[in-house]
Regions:
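Exposed beta-strand-loop-beta-strand "reactive/processing" segments of non-cytosolic proteins
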Residues: 43-72
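Short, non-transmembrane alpha-helical segments in secretory-pathway proteins
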Residues: 22-46, 93-101
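Sec-dependent N-terminal signal peptides of Gram-positive bacterial secreted proteins and lipoproteins
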Residues: 1-24
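A short, surface-exposed beta-strand/turn
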Residues: 66-89
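Extracytoplasmic electrostatic interaction patches
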Residues: 93-94, 102-227
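Terminal accessory regions that mediate trafficking to/through membranes and regulate activation
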Residues: 6, 20, 36, 57-59
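Short, ordered beta-strand-loop transition motifs
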Residues: 48-53, 74, 110-117
């Protein structure tokens, strides 16, 4: 009998949450439809309720092979509740990367979707001159998305960061082997792209031009001080 009361309380709490969720079903669908109409326009998508009743599957007419979900989340402690959540960014971004790689060779480089950034392009070079090739590949991806998946740009999902190894910045720690360089920023009026020349101008003065000397300075009587 001691355990009966906690069990009853848990059952009542679960029933309340469940009934509350079901009670919001119609309201949630209307909220999602308003959101979709505002983002993509009326009659540009199909929407189907999941069997769980808590989310809706949406397919844009322009992209019939891709289906994403939308759901309404409620948090009584949040000032922004209820809010709409979706896996749109992940589904469309990963698909765009997959399709781009089918027809564009990246060599030893890699391009991935990262939900905290959008896209990350990984490359290893020995000089800024070598950086031109991976930079052009990243620009090729932007051109590909602009042509095939412009909805990503419309939704502000084309931020690209280039993670560079092989060259190092002055004063960098021994374990600090990465240079992070933003090359594309999604803004309300389109994309802000950093040119290759701008990247070189920014990084050139900061790069190490010689390997670290663990023994410190070396002096030569005939030629003076060398590093």
């Amino acid at each position: 009998m001691k355990f009966l009361k906690p069990i009853v309380i848990l059952f009542l709490l679960f029933s309340t949450v469940l009934s509350g969720g079901c009670g919001h079903t119609k309201e949630d669908k209307e909220r999602i439809i308003r959101y979709l109409d505002n983002r993509f326009g009326k009659d540009t998508y199909t929407i189907k309720q999941d069997e769980s009743y808590y989310r809706w599957f949406v397919t844009l007419n322009q992209y019939p092979d891709l289906t994403v979900y939308y759901t309404v989340s409620r948090d009584p402690l949040s000032m922004t509740s209820p809010s709409i959540t979706t896996n749109f960014d992940e589904v469309f971004s990963e698909h765009a990367v997959e399709e781009y790689k089918k027809t564009h060779a990246l060599g030893d480089d890699d391009l991935v979707f990262d939900d905290s950034i959008d896209f990350v392009y990984h490359t290893k070079v020995k000089s800024l001159e070598e950086l031109k090739v991976p930079y052009d590949r990243a620009m090729g991806f932007i051109a590909f998305v602009s042509e095939k998946y412009p909805v990503l740009i419309d939704e502000g999902v084309l931020n690209i960061r280039m993670d560079i190894t092989g060259i190092r910045l002055k004063g960098a720690d021994d374990d600090d082997t990465l240079i992070f360089q933003d090359i594309s920023k999604a803004k309300k009026d389109g994309l802000s792209i950093v040119s290759y020349e701008e990247i070189c101008q920014e990084l050139a003065p900061k790069l190490k031009t010689h390997a670290d000397n663990p023994d410190g300075f070396t002096f030569h009587a005939d030629i003076g001080k060398s590093f």
